């Protein structure tokens, strides 16, 4: 279509009015500036996913009336954002002669002693059920402290409460970032094994990675893959971006020997654990593919032995304290793990336990009663995992790292996971998250993850999001948010529709960014938002205003076939040469992405065309590196022989940027050529199962990693 806006006739239609009323986009402009209007059947389906009936004309009008009436008659919004240091106005509804009375209970349980002023509202009077509703405003004072508070408002004998999220205006940069920058490494934790590993990298390996990278290279952070909770027994989803829960962490990374209980095992039990470890030690030398399931089956046997040995009085008290701190939320994951353990993986059928039963089902209660020890075992595993991850971050800070762990937050969760099964009301029903068509994915993308329901978020004070962010900052110095545009809008795809047949649903980004600012400030941490691709100007502006860094990837910093000089990159970003969706630098320079896509049948056109495009990109990058003085032109005479020099030039370019954070990839530093993840594949390629190896295919063990000559050369460049 040539128009870029909806006409008045379309805007007046009830289905369009209803969609806009609840934040559903009825049109959008694509990446190529192409304009699209959303079909009615898509809007009806997305409204249904929000719990709103739009099945016919009468239902649409009734839904509009119901929603508007609810908004007009509620005294206060369920969730209110307050910016610390500024006055905030809260809209209050009541009768013309009613005088609102308000009080605030602070997060710590005390009463706010300051004065809450009342300010007159608009002259607009709304007639509702034969009465009249007027609007006035409560003014929350600038000195209201940060935190999650409870606002209680009484009007005309009726009382309502609202969650007040009192957050800093922005996240302040760390002192070392204000005038300069910090650099660190990025890696996939599971891929880096030591002699003490059980087949994949674990939390003890992470501790060593952090401490050794600071000690031997001067790095100040380690960006790692998401550590969200996974399945408790095989089959285990390999992608860390499709977790069972984002509230809890992955206990398959536990190192049994690092637990205090291991040290006091009986000789017989200790011998059993050691023998189990010996069984999987050969996995550490496999350079081809990681075997998570064999690793976990074996490690789990060892953990059962340790669990059954019991806890000392002090350790039991620490476990009890953990359970008290996490509250009832631990029951969601532990119960789901028990069900998965005993009833198996979801198969999607109507008889599937995930569909058939819910948290209150009698069958679930019976299973919990039948296996109390297994239920406690899963609670215990989560506690142990949390302890070991926390110990890794603590060791990083004690070693002198300014940040330590940069945790990665996935976009969403598995549709059959514990978050969705335990609290389905928090999620949209009958829709998944994805992306509209673009130049790389002409049919759009469906990520198979149910979106959070923005209406439920508002009604519950965004508690699920608050808890998740708080949990991540408990064990990290920074959080990277995958697809941060999702805090502003998400592409919803109705069940049964193609990925292209969806629309955007908007979220209250100010509140979600406020939560990030509050949790990051409390932790003295940093937030990085993955904002690659085309980002609306208002999103970039909002992220910047909140002190959230974006992402700059050297291979993506191009326009019209020319690469942007690193000195011209935006400063408020985490810069890297590549991402986990691309081959490492050596593989990319050797056109590994072309070869792999051809091999897997992922090319939409002739391989010659893709190769030609890749060569043009390749040559443009090398030209930029030469023009900017990062690479001597003589290196181009034999690129393969001078590959290390070219990779060094890529990193000299990275170091030449003004970006506040810079990350070097460990895979680049050891010469690895294989990509960790090939988008558009599942079983065709071993995504998220590639162990760390050098360019010759030899395993690089953690014990030798920081003595690697190439790694030290790249570290020297990053230190400047």
Name each model feature, range by range.
Residues 12, 407, 506-510:
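Amphipathic, non-membrane alpha-helical segments in soluble helical-bundle scaffolds
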Residues 157, 215-216, 394-404, 473-479, ...:
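Secondary-structure transition/capping motifs at alpha-helix termini
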């Amino acid at each position: 279509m040539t128009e870029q806006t909806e006409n008045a006739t379309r805007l007046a239609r009830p289905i369009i009015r209803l969609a806009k009323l609840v934040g559903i986009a009825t049109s959008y402009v694509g990446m190529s500036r192409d304009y699209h209007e959303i079909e009615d059947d898509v809007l009806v389906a997305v409204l249904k996913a929000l719990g709103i009936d739009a099945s016919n004309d009468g239902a649409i009008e009734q839904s509009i009336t119901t929603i508007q009436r609810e908004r007009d008659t509620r005294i206060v919004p369920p969730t209110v954002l307050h910016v610390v240091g500024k006055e905030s106005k809260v809209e209050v509804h009541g009768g013309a002669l009613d005088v609102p009375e308000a009080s605030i209970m602070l997060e710590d349980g005390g009463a706010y002693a300051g004065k809450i002023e009342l300010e007159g509202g608009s002259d607009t009077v709304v007639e509702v059920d034969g009465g009249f509703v007027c609007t006035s405003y409560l003014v929350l004072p600038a000195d209201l402290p940060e935190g999650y508070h409870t606002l209680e408002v009484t009007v005309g004998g009726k009382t309502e409460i609202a969650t007040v999220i009192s957050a800093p205006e922005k996240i302040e940069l760390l002192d070392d970032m204000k005038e300069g920058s910090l650099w660190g490494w990025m890696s996939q934790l599971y891929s880096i094994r030591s002699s003490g590993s059980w087949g994949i990298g674990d939390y003890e390996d992470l501790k060593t990675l952090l401490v050794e990278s600071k000690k031997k290279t001067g790095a100040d952070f380690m960006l790692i893959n998401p550590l969200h909770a996974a399945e408790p027994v095989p089959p285990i989803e390999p992608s860390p971006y499709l977790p069972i829960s984002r509230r809890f962490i992955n206990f398959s990374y536990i190192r049994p020997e690092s637990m205090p209980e291991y040290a006091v095992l009986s000789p017989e039990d200790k011998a059993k654990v050691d023998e189990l470890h010996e069984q999987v030690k050969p996995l550490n030398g496999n350079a081809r593919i990681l075997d998570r399931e064999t690793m976990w089956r074996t490690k789990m046997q060892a953990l059962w032995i340790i669990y059954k040995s019991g806890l000392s009085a002090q350790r039991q008290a620490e476990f009890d304290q953990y359970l008290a701190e996490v509250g009832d939320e631990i029951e969601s994951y532990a119960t789901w793990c028990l069900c998965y353990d005993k009833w198996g993986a979801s198969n999607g059928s109507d008889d599937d336990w995930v569909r058939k039963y819910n948290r209150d089902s009698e069958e679930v209660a019976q299973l919990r009663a039948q296996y109390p020890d297994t239920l406690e075992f899963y609670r215990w595993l989560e506690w142990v995992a949390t302890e070991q991850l926390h110990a890794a971050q603590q060791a990083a800070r004690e070693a002198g790292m300014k940040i330590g762990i940069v945790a990665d937050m996935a976009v969403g969760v598995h549709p059959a996971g514990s978050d969705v099964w335990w609290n389905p009301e928090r999620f949209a029903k009958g829709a998944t998250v994805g992306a509209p068509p673009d130049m790389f994915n002409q049919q759009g993308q469906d990520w198979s993850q149910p979106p959070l329901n923005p209406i439920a978020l508002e009604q519950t004070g965004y508690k699920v999001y608050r808890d998740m962010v708080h949990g991540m900052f408990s064990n990290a110095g920074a959080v990277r948010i995958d697809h941060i545009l999702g805090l502003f809008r998400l592409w919803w795809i109705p069940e049964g529709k193609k990925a292209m047949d969806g629309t955007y649903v908007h979220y209250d980004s100010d509140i979600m960014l406020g939560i990030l600012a509050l949790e990051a400030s409390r932790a003295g941490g940093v937030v990085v938002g993955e904002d690659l691709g085309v980002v609306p100007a208002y999103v970039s502006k909002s992220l910047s205003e909140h002190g959230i860094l974006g992402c700059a990837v050297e291979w993506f910093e191009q326009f019209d076939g020319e690469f942007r000089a690193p000195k011209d990159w935006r400063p408020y970003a985490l810069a890297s040469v590549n991402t986990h969706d691309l081959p490492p630098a050596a593989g990319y320079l050797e056109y590994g992405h072309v070869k792999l896509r051809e091999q897997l049948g992922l090319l939409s056109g002739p391989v010659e065309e893709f190769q030609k495009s890749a060569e043009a990109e390749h040559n443009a990058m090398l030209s930029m590196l030469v023009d900017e003085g990062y690479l001597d032109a003589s290196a181009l005479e034999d690129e393969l022989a001078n590959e290390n020099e070219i990779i060094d030039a890529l990193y000299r370019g990275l170091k030449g940027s003004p970006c506040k954070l810079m990350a070097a990839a460990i895979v680049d530093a050891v010469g690895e050529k294989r990509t960790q993840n090939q988008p558009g594949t599942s079983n065709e390629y071993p995504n998220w199962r590639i162990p760390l190896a050098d360019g010759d295919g030899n395993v690089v063990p953690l014990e030798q990693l920081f003595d690697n000559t190439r790694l030290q050369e790249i570290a020297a460049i990053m230190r400047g």
